[in-house]
Amino acid sequence: LLGRLAAIVANEVLLGHKVVVVRCEGINISGNFYRNKLKYLAFLRKRMNTNPSRGPYHFRAPSRIFWRTVRGMLPHKTKRGQAALERLKVFDGVPPPYDKRKRMVVPAALKIVRLKPTRKFALLGRLAHEVGWKYQAITATLEEKRKEKAKIRYAKKKTVTKLSKLAEKNVESTISKYTAVLKQYGVLV
């Protein structure tokens, strides 16, 4: 859920941790879609009357919407808050350096944990698309490609671990005297 995740991320960056949030288009917002869209459209109407180019700026990409939500939870006009915001990176989809990294979820922000099964919710990706984000289709195709690659990579990893286990089993009898010595000195546990 958008707000809960943003609150946890805001705390983490204030504590000095670097945080990267990927697949922002998959974030959920509680409340039905139509209500959330009306809220966002009301936000779009807020502008400087004499010169709208001076702000407030309305970001359309899910990653930027999330980034702005986090910014609202930080003292972003102070040096400390600015430094915290620089420690946060947000992305739509999972771009190359992070597609091979281990990712984690925040259980306290999961929809299944926090919302009753009957409650309505909206997807940030769909909301963004309907208020002017142009890259929903591209992001979706790139995600499909990434998932295919990840599947292949995982299959390869599984075979490698299987082979290494087999190799360990094969040489177990020949290196047993060495392992006994290593265990004696506490190198192997």
Swiss-Prot record:
Record has Secreted as a keyword: no
GO MF, one example: mRNA binding
A biological-process GO annotation: negative regulation of translation
Record Pfam families: Ribosomal_L13
GO cellular component: cytosolic large ribosomal subunit
PROSITE patterns: RIBOSOMAL_L13
Highest taxon, organism lineage: Eukaryota
Keyword line: Ribonucleoprotein, Ribosomal protein
Entry keyword annotation includes Ubl conjugation: no
InterPro entries attached to this UniProt entry: Ribosomal_uL13 (IPR005822), Ribosomal_uL13_CS (IPR023563), Ribosomal_uL13_euk/arc (IPR005755), Ribosomal_uL13_sf (IPR036899)
Disulfide bond residue pairs: none
Family membership: Belongs to the universal ribosomal protein uL13 family.
Official protein name in the record: Large ribosomal subunit protein uL13
Organism: Salmo trutta
Gene (name only): rpl13a
